[in-house]
């Protein structure tokens, strides 16, 4: 992995490839490369280690590499160290077949040994070079065409992959194939684009095809032909991407993350409005009926990372509003557990990209067991969106920063809306009560805007926190779930060691980590748990901790305890997480800025984890 872009048309390919790759930088990478063909000439390949700027220098921003057909790649090392040699594209021995690849080929060592016996030589440590030479093997040995050669290779390869391949004998054409790893194809004005994610081509077209699992596509100027793995031609419908191209730009902000934090009021409002008709929740577009909801006996929420933290918060809300027991599971663990899923269950899969490998595998596991699945995703046409029985689309738009903010917030409100409608459908909440809570939910975007007005105070505290070696977050109930997200933000972009604990668990071990000056951030928005969490904060303060209190207006006694206090507007306690998470996002952001780090592209991380 991590980013793929391809183009064939009349324009010069290199600038388009470099521009597309720059839109995928948020996915994380350690090297980059392009291969471009000028008519029937041999492809010119340029690769570099490090930032994309190095590749741009080598190619004079693409002007030095001529041709109207090409493929490009940003690599995040999985097999082989980060280096120019291991960077993509990779080629056959005679350079007549060239390819880039996302994913992991699990049996690459076995295939490499067999190809070596057939006199192929390998110069890199990558599994991608194995894929290229396997395609070349079938292409030459059996005198096959590109589609047949790729299909034969796909049958032999085990693992996940998205491939873009060029053949010297087929100028102006790009061949793509995928299994489990995302790939989209765009078309506009007689030109054709391919990419691993929407932002790479959004500037050029909003009309895209989604290439399915175990499918192959042939790209020509303004034309795409699709095949299944049996080499039979298949038809597909174009999908229009609704995202605004400007949403994938910084728009005057220093970082995408800060821009996306400020976009949260709008995207939360849009997501709420997407399922409200005549003042009531309407899930007709999701396809989830009241009758189905009334029969659900158990809910499993399955996700990874921040989406898992969403699930933890939503669990409390659903269980408060309904009598349905809810279990929240890490997708990477769920799929391997020998658990019996309760009949009439619902498995909710939460994923911004809709391509998260472990979440997708968990969805398939649930479907195999005959359990209804619901995807909460942000990308229309993504794998989870296509395969889930029901889909709730969040309207966050393109999220570029690796650290999620606005997608998290839209997932959270999607969870609230599900909880409310489950309660009404099951007769556990009146329409009147639901209407009152909806009215309060509609105030959340305005209250987020009010919190953002206080960001300078949070920046001041972040500057003091930047020198910390450790940081701890504590809370109870929903506040604990929000603390987990705040802790993740801190560690993933500021590289400060950070952990979150249920406040009641401090005395069972974690309190031994508290020493003089260590920052402890307490989240206290659940009024019935306020005094208990305060007592835990008193415990850590007595052992030398420096306290930040995050609570609602009216809890002014926090001033007497904490060294720094952030207040959020009052709201229904079930929805408080949508407000309390905002200062924690800002805190993580400003600590990272104070330390001089690349906020949008933290080390060792990728935006969309499409391998296991």
Please state what every model-predicted region is.
Residues 264-268, 272-300, 390-519, 592-612:
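Active-site phosphate/pyrophosphate-binding segments
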Residues 294-436, 440-443, 523-568, 587, ...:
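Glycine-rich phosphate-binding loops that contact phosphosugars or nucleotide phosphates
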Residues 1-250, 254, 266-297, 336, ...:
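Conserved short alpha-helical segments that host acidic/polar catalytic motifs at enzyme active sites
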Residues 4, 99, 165, 176, ...:
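Structural beta-sheet core signal
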Residues 68, 72-85, 275-290, 314-350, ...:
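Glycine-rich oxoanion-binding loops at beta->alpha junctions
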Residues 231, 546, 559-561, 571-612:
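Generic C-terminus detector
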């Amino acid at each position: 992995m991590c980013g793929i872009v391809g183009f064939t048309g009349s324009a010069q390919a290199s600038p388009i490839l470099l521009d597309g790759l720059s839109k995928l930088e948020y996915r994380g990478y350690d090297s980059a490369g392009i291969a471009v063909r000028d008519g029937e000439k041999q492809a010119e390949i340029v690769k570099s280690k490090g930032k994309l700027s190095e590749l741009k220098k080598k190619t004079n921003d693409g002007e030095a590499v001529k041709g109207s057909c090409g493929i490009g790649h940003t690599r995040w090392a999985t097999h082989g160290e980060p280096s120019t040699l291991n960077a993509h594209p990779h080629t056959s021995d005679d350079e007549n077949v060239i390819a880039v690849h996302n994913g992991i080929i699990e049996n690459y060592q076995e295939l490499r040994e067999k190809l070596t016996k057939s006199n192929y030589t390998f110069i890199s440590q990558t599994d991608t070079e194995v894929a290229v030479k396997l395609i070349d093997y079938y292409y030459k040995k059996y005198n096959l065409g590109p589609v047949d050669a790729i299909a034969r290779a796909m049958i032999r390869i085990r693992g996940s992959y998205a491939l873009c391949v060029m053949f010297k004998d087929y100028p102006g054409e790009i061949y793509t194939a995928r299994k489990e790893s995302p790939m989209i194809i765009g078309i506009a004005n007689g030109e054709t684009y391919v990419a691993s994610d929407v932002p790479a081509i959004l500037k050029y077209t909003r009309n895209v095809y989604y290439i399915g699992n175990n499918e192959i596509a042939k790209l020509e100027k303004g034309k795409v032909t699709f095949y299944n793995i049996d080499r039979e031609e298949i038809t597909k419908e174009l999908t229009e991407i609704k995202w605004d191209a400007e949403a994938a730009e910084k728009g005057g902000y220093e970082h995408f993350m800060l821009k996306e934090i400020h976009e949260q009021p709008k995207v939360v409002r849009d997501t709420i409005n997407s399922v409200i008709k005549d003042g009531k929740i309407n899930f007709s577009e999701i396809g989830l009926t009241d009758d189905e909801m009334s029969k659900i006996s158990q809910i499993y929420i399955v996700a990874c990372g921040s989406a898992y933290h969403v699930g933890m918060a939503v669990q409390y809300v659903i269980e408060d509003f309904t009598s349905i027991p809810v279990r929240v599971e890490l997708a990477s663990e769920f799929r391997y557990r020998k658990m019996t899923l309760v009949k009439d269950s619902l498995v909710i899969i939460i994923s911004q990209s809709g391509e998260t490998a472990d979440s997708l595998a968990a969805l398939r596991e649930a479907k195999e067991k005959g359990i209804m699945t619901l995807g909460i995703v942000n990308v229309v046409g993504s794998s989870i969106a296509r395969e889930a029985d029901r889909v709730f689309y969040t309207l966050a738009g393109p999220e570029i920063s690796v650290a999620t903010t606005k997608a998290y917030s839209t997932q959270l409100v999607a969870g609230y809306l599900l909880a409310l409608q489950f309660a009404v459908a099951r007769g556990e909440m009146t329409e009147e009560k639901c209407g009152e809570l909806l009215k309060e939910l509609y105030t959340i975007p305005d209250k987020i805007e009010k919190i953002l007005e206080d960001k300078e105070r949070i920046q001041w505290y972040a500057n003091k926190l930047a020198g910390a070696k450790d940081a701890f977050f504590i809370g109870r109930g929903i506040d604990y779930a929000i603390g987990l997200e705040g802790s993740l933000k801190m560690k993933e972009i500021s590289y400060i060691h950070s952990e979150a604990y249920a406040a009641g668990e401090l005395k069972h071990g974690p309190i031994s980590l508290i020493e003089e000056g260590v920052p402890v951030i307490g989240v206290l928005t659940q009024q019935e748990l306020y005094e208990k969490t305060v007592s835990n904060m008193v415990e850590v303060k007595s052992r030398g901790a420096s306290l930040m209190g995050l609570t609602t207006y009216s809890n002014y006694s926090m001033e007497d305890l904490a060294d720094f206090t952030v207040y959020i507007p009052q709201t229904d306690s079930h929805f408080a997480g949508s407000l309390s998470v905002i200062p924690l996002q800002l805190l993580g952001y400003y600590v990272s800025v104070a330390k001089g780090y690349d906020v949008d592209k933290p080390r060792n991380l990728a935006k969309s984890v499409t391998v296991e």
